[in-house]
Amino acid sequence: AFRRTAKAIAEWVDAVNVTDGQGAHVRMASWAGSLVLLEEGVEPVMQVQCRDRNRIALQSDILSAGALRVPNLMMLGGDPPSAGDDPDAKPVFDLDSVGLLRVAKSMRDDKRLMSGREVPNGPRWLLGAAENPYTPLSAGPYDRFAAKIAAGAQFVQTQFVFDVPGFARFIQEGGLHGLGVFGAQIKDVAHFDAT
């Protein structure tokens, strides 16, 4: 079903998010879904979340994405296991999304793993992050956003845009520094499951 859907949408989309255990539910691995999309001529945005893997496994998955020539990685913290279909699962969170961005940027730019070991043929990716544009201003929402930019985010995806003035405030006050921001609109989003 996943491959069939990829074929059907190939000419209609610029890129497709491939989630990584979205909502703390068991799904196809994001690198595998990304490979299917690449084979069908669809550009993937491979999501990598920190909930289920330690830094060794995360770096291994990122290296695998590079070997498969996945062009875009989006680093996420991950939903808590209690939100999913197996609430007794133990979360890992060895890194957070900012730390994972730093790691991927170092692997790409410095050709180094966290251990300092060299990555001979450093992968090339566009690195992204997610941001909630509706966090109350009193919560200091842009500190974490600024940290993601400093860590290497080159694009940001937001949650669905229902409040256009609130989204405009985020764009104006968020300190985007030339970053590409993709505000998700319901009419532009095609959802299909990689189960």
Residue ranges and their predicted role:
Residues 1-18:
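Conserved N-terminal beta1-alpha1 strand-loop-helix module at the mouth
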Residues 16, 65, 148, 152:
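Conserved, mostly hydrophobic/aromatic
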Residues 16-26, 48-50, 74-76, 154-163:
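Catalytic beta/alpha-barrel core
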Residues 1, 22, 44-56, 125-140:
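Active-site mouth loops of central-metabolism enzymes
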Residues 50-68:
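Glycine-rich anion/phosphate-binding loops
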Residues 176-195:
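N-terminal low-complexity segments that are often proline-rich with Ser/Thr-Pro
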Residues 15-17, 43-47, 72-74, 124-128, ...:
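Structural preference for beta-strand elements that scaffold enzyme active sites
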Residues 24-36, 54-60, 80-116, 138-140, ...:
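Active-site-adjacent beta->alpha loops and helix N-cap segments on the catalytic face
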